[in-house]
Amino acid sequence: MKLPIYLDYSATTPVDPRVAEKMMQFLTLDGTFGNPASRSHRFGWQAEEAVDIARNQIAELVGADPREIVFTSGATESDNLAIKGAANFYQKKGKHIITSKTEHKAVLDTCRQLEREGFEVTYLAPQRNGIIDLNELEAAMRDDTILVSIMHVNNEIGVVQDIATIGEMCRARGIIYHVDATQSVGKLPIDLSQLKVDLMSFSGHKIYGPKGIGALYVRRKPRIRIEAQMHGGGHERGMRSGTLPVHQIVGMGEAYRIAKEEMETEMARLRGLRNRLWNGIKDIEEVYLNGDLEQGAPNILNVSFNYVEGESLIMALKDLAVSSGSACTSASLEPSYVLRALGMNDELAHSSIRFSLGRFTTEEEIDYAIDLVRKSIGRLRDLSPLWEMYKQGVDLNSIEWAHH
């Protein structure tokens, strides 16, 4: 077993060796390096064929028509293109958007930008377990609501929203429904031929493909229109200009192909490892599970250890690559906005750790992690005056701290 142990697969994944090997064939002179938009010679045709194959592989994993897949630079761009693109195109119908407080920043910050441009956004607060109350969603829908954006799997706590029912609700009212599926694609079954989802964002690097490539699903029947955010050569049926990065697209396609083949067995394995991890630490005093194991992705476990400062815990766990909050926001020392939205106090939110498991995680690594967490929590609490006061029965909420 090699240290440190990587348990931050929700931040990014290593590229699968099979994917890397495939990508190498699309870079150099003796490979397929052409521009897929070059229509006048074989180099371009071969590149275009490689892109077509990858587009099919991605469509097959999610039950889409390959013509509904638009390549982007990643899920952040896909979220921007979907939300801004739909809002701008349909703004004559209305200017009201609904999303949730626990969405990824790529969705929340895009909505904030649209608010500056005159749109109105309703931010739904989830229930204590992170799931959106569908009655609240229904109550928020208005005649001028044009777009709902609710993610599939939350990147911090792993809860799974009921995108099938939300899709039915939106379709019945003629509202466009966008889903950020970055954390769920290849981990949970997605069948867009059955789901009433109009726009869906995907990433390459959360599923053992390369960074810098993603896709947006744009439904054809009923046809969804979006306004391009990037202008140029009119690539990707006018929705996203820019020369297609063939090697990255091929890598994403191969990653999605592998995911389709291995998803069922891999998810059962990861669910077992996640449960093993939780069972190994759940009897520590004052430990709380954030999210919902039953309605949760099989690979994410978010846990709060009360009376332990999260950053000091991460330092103590230096042999484990884990995160507090998500990588996209961990540059700030603010407690996780996702956990705050669940109604958690700052102290508990600060003491939370996200463990996310993946394809190369082993049972041996999980057992090592359990042992290390138990020892570290014990050691840090021995040093903590708060823990001592708690053990003496002092109500810490009633204490007035002196300001020196």
Curated annotation (Swiss-Prot):
Catalytic residue positions: 328
HAMAP family: Cys_desulf_IscS
Native organism taxonomy: Bacteria, Pseudomonadati, Pseudomonadota, Gammaproteobacteria, Enterobacterales
Binding site for [2Fe-2S] cluster: 328
Cellular compartment(s): Cytoplasm
Subunit comment: Homodimer. Forms a heterotetramer with IscU, interacts with other sulfur acceptors.
SUPFAM superfamilies associated with the record: PLP-dependent transferases
Keywords: 2Fe-2S, Cytoplasm, Iron, Iron-sulfur, Metal-binding, Pyridoxal phosphate, Transferase
Positions of modified residues (N6-(pyridoxal phosphate)lysine): 206
EC number: 2.8.1.7
One of the record's GO cellular component terms: L-cysteine desulfurase complex
Pathway terms, separated by semicolons: Cofactor biosynthesis; iron-sulfur cluster biosynthesis
Cofactor(s) annotated in UniProt: pyridoxal 5'-phosphate
Protein name according to UniProt: Cysteine desulfurase IscS
Annotated disulfide bonds: none
Enzyme class: transferase
Family membership: Belongs to the class-V pyridoxal-phosphate-dependent aminotransferase family. NifS/IscS subfamily.
Reaction equation(s) it catalyzes: (sulfur carrier)-H + L-cysteine = (sulfur carrier)-SH + L-alanine
Entry function: Master enzyme that delivers sulfur to a number of partners involved in Fe-S cluster assembly, tRNA modification or cofactor biosynthesis. Catalyzes the removal of elemental sulfur and selenium atoms from cysteine and selenocysteine to produce alanine. Functions as a sulfur delivery protein for Fe-S cluster synthesis onto IscU, an Fe-S scaffold assembly protein, as well as other S acceptor proteins. Also functions as a selenium delivery protein in the pathway for the biosynthesis of selenophosphate.
InterPro entries associated with the record: Aminotrans_V_dom, Aminotrans_V_PyrdxlP_BS, Cys_deSase_IscS, Cysteine_dSase, PyrdxlP-dep_Trfase, PyrdxlP-dep_Trfase_major, PyrdxlP-dep_Trfase_small
UniProt-annotated binding residues for pyridoxal 5'-phosphate: 75-76, 155, 183, 203-205, 243
Superkingdom assignment: Bacteria
Classification via PANTHER family: CYSTEINE DESULFURASE, CYSTEINE DESULFURYLASE FAMILY MEMBER
GO annotation (BP), single: [2Fe-2S] cluster assembly
Gene Ontology MF terms: 2 iron, 2 sulfur cluster binding; cysteine desulfurase activity; metal ion binding; pyridoxal phosphate binding
